From Swiss-Prot:
It comes from Varecia variegata. The lineage of its organism: Eukaryota, Metazoa, Chordata, Craniata, Vertebrata. GO terms for biological process: ATP synthesis coupled electron transport. The chain crosses the membrane at residues 15-45, 60-87. Cu cation A2 binds at residues 196, 198, 200, 204. Component of the cytochrome c oxidase (complex IV, CIV), a multisubunit enzyme composed of 14 subunits. The complex is composed of a catalytic core of 3 subunits MT-CO1, MT-CO2 and MT-CO3, encoded in the mitochondrial DNA, and 11 supernumerary subunits COX4I, COX5A, COX5B, COX6A, COX6B, COX6C, COX7A, COX7B, COX7C, COX8 and NDUFA4, which are encoded in the nuclear genome. The gene is MT-CO2. The keyword Cytoplasm does not apply. Its EC number is 7.1.1.9. It is found in: Mitochondrion inner membrane. This is Cytochrome c oxidase subunit 2. It catalyses: 4 Fe(II)-[cytochrome c] + O2 + 8 H(+)(in) = 4 Fe(III)-[cytochrome c] + 2 H2O + 4 H(+)(out).
Length: 227
């Protein structure tokens, strides 16, 4: 989860989020090198008295500044496309979770089981227990197993919403009349928080998402207790 005055990403808890962090560092390093080169050239131009006013063209320089940016863009595009296809690929999911956005709460349905569905509202500040987080706790958490591929089907009953859990690298728009899908797989147990990330009205800030990821054995016990 996020912390006050946090500047970086949340700790990755899924393979996809780890790949996104690697890609971020990769791209940031390329940008840093380009910025350093540009600053060096600017400082060189400001400090030297040498000029070439009679130069009309320079084929070598033009070739370099055409090929070099193209190569840099390829170095950025290839890892990006790889992650894009990884996020879109859903093969043999172990569980399917249907998520519907409402003004201003979420409803969930475990489509693999009968009558396992519930609404998830934000817990009011007056009902918070010691240690619970303001504006992030809900009355019904989504319980899912770890280390299993889970497909989420996401849509909306009214306006645009966005189902987002940063630690798991998931952010999918909930669009009325359209069913989007995403895949998630947690690499370790824990409680992961998210929020609606699409402005959806007056109470947009009060649509938290809480996922409780537990080992498969405990998930089966939870199913027996719930059903």
């Amino acid at each position: 989860m996020a912390h006050p005055v946090q500047l970086g990403f949340q700790d990755a808890a899924s393979p996809i989020m780890e790949e996104l962090l690697y890609f971020h560092d990769h791209t940031l390093m390329i940008m840093f090198l380009i910025s350093s080169l540009v600053l060096y050239i600017i400082s060189l131009m400001l400090t030297t008295k040498l000029t070439h006013t009679s130069t009309m063209d320079a084929q070598e320089v033009e070739t370099v500044w055409t090929i070099l940016p193209a190569a840099i863009l390829i170095l950025i595009a290839l890892p990006s496309l790889r992650i894009l296809y990884m996020m879109d690929e859903i093969t043999s999911p172990s569980l399917t979770l249907k998520t519907m956005g409402h003004q201003w709460y979420w409803s969930y349905e475990y489509t693999d089981y009968e009558n396992l569905c519930f609404d998830s509202y934000m817990t009011p500040c007056s009902d918070l227990k010691p240690g619970e987080l303001r504006l992030l706790e809900v009355d019904n958490r989504v319980v899912l197993p770890t280390e299993l591929s889970i497909r989420t089907l996401i849509s909306s009953e009214d306006v645009l919403h966005s189902w987002t859990v940063p630690s798991l690298g998931v952010k999918t728009d909930a669009i009325p009349g359209r069913l989007n899908q995403a895949t998630l797989m947690a690499s370790r147990p824990g409680v992961y928080y998210g929020q609606c990330s699409e402005i959806c009205g007056a109470n947009h800030s009060f649509m938290p998402i809480v996922l409780e990821l537990i080992p498969l054995k405990h998930f089966e016990e939870w199913l027996l207790f719930t059903l």
